[in-house]
């Protein structure tokens, strides 16, 4: 059959990324404990395209995905190399977003329940392998200003802490989640009995944090790891008494002007 994708193109325009996106795919993730967790990922995968080629072979991306037994940051290089070879490209790229469940025990009743974290792995292979891993962690914040000016109580709410890093050594998703939760007013749990709810409410009240505080506390912990060469941290608070969200963010390498 005629291979239309391999026809010559004479417009002389190089394409940075060509591929498929928003494909949902069942995958297995290796956890920090060495076990496997099954989940469903949303995947974007692509290659570059030479200026003299009309198109790429889209089905080959799915063929590569079909051969993945499990996913781990340390085997992404092999996957991207296979993509590059199959598509005869100079660079290959992948972005994988998936729900990941971490079981936590409630602070008082000690009942384990799963908490969902959104995880991201984004990687590119050209001359070198570049990789970013990230998490979106639900947390609890309590407003220091509200506590200070009120005779009793303070407004508090759920928030999301986003942490993205480049690291020269493996940093587990669980490690990033722990950093986010330690930096919050209190963690979030799927299940809370009354003694747990009391404990969390009082913990948050005794540990008030602005979104600015949470971001700075997260960054302070990331800076302790010399193998982390880049990070981006953003915290968004779903304000309970305002008709807007509050956020703060920072990226390593930003220059103050």
Swiss-Prot record:
Biological pathway: Cofactor biosynthesis; 7,8-dihydroneopterin triphosphate biosynthesis; 7,8-dihydroneopterin triphosphate from GTP: step 1/1
Feature type site, description May be catalytically important: 143
Biological process annotations from GO: tetrahydrofolate biosynthetic process
Enzyme Commission number, as recorded: 3.5.4.16
Presence of the UniProt keyword Magnesium in the record: no
InterPro entries to which the protein is assigned, alphabetical: GTP_cyclohydrolase_FolE2, GTP_cyclohydrolase_FolE2/MptA
Reaction catalyzed: GTP + H2O = 7,8-dihydroneopterin 3'-triphosphate + formate + H(+)
A Pfam family the protein falls into: GCHY-1
Disulfide bonding pattern of the chain: none
Keywords (A to Z) from UniProt: Hydrolase
Hydrolase listed as a keyword: yes
Alphabetical list of Gene3D superfamilies matching this protein: Urate Oxidase (3.10.270.10)
A GO molecular function held by the record: GTP cyclohydrolase activity
Enzyme class per UniProt: hydrolase
Highest rank taxon of the organism: Bacteria
PANTHER family in alphabetical order: GTP CYCLOHYDROLASE MPTA
NCBIfam families xrefs: PRK13674.1-1 (NF010200)
HAMAP family per UniProt: GTP_cyclohydrol_B
Function, in words: Converts GTP to 7,8-dihydroneopterin triphosphate.
Family: Belongs to the GTP cyclohydrolase IV family.
Protein name stated in the entry: GTP cyclohydrolase FolE2
High-level lineage: Bacteria, Pseudomonadati, Dictyoglomota, Dictyoglomia, Dictyoglomales
């Amino acid at each position: 059959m005629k291979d239309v994708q391999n026809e010559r193109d004479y417009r002389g325009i190089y394409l940075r990324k060509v591929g498929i996106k928003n494909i949902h795919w069942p995958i297995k993730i290796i956890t920090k404990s060495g076990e496997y967790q099954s989940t469903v990922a949303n995947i974007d995968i692509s290659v570059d395209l030479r200026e003299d080629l009309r198109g790429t072979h889209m089905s080959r991306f799915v063929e590569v995905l079909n051969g993945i037994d499990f996913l781990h940051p340390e085997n992404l290089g092999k996957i991207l190399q296979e993509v590059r070879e199959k598509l005869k490209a100079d660079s290959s790229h992948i972005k994988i977003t998936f729900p990941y469940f971490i079981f936590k025990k409630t602070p008082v009743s000690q009942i384990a329940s799963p908490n969902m974290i959104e995880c991201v792995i984004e990687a590119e292979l050209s001359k070198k392998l570049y990789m970013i891993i990230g998490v979106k962690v639900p947390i609890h914040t309590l407003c220091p200003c509200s506590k200070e000016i009120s005779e009793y109580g303070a407004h508090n709410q759920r928030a999301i802490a986003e942490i993205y890093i480049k690291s020269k050594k493996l940093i587990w998703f669980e490690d990033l989640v722990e950093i986010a939760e330690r930096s919050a007013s209190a963690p979030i749990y799927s299940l809370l009995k009354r003694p747990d709810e009391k404990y969390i409410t009082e913990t948050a009240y005794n540990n008030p944090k602005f979104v600015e505080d949470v971001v700075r506390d997260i960054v302070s912990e990331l800076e302790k790891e010399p193998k982390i060469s880049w990070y981006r941290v953003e915290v968004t608070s779903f304000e309970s008494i305002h008709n807007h969200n509050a956020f703060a963010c920072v990226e390593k390498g930003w220059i103050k002007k």
